[in-house]
Amino acid sequence: MKKFFRKIAGYIVTIYANRIYRKAVKEADRVHAERGEMIYVASSIEDVRELVIYNRYKFRQMKKRLFIPKFYISNLKDGAWYFTPDRSGKNGLTEQEREVRRLAFVQHVLHRAKLV
């Protein structure tokens, strides 16, 4: 019976993680369409299950405020769950990369919920 409830909890957490991811990606795409700048979707520092949207300026402010000297934009790009293309439309994620990162986020949330 315990395995059954664990499996149901896994499905619910998976649905929850997919919902959070899609919402953050939609918001990042909306901001990118308005401003044209590169937007990154990464995990929040306070709550790993929460996704935060950064642009480069906001990232630099957070870096100064939290005193993270060894974290650069290239680290953010590698560690982000999603990022939009730049102004010229280059350097964005392909559909395959996007799907891989979505699945990695779902696995990350399942791991944090101790269901994997």
Regions inferred by a protein language model and the residue ranges of each:
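Acidic/polar low-complexity segments and flexible, solvent-exposed patches
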Residues: 2-116
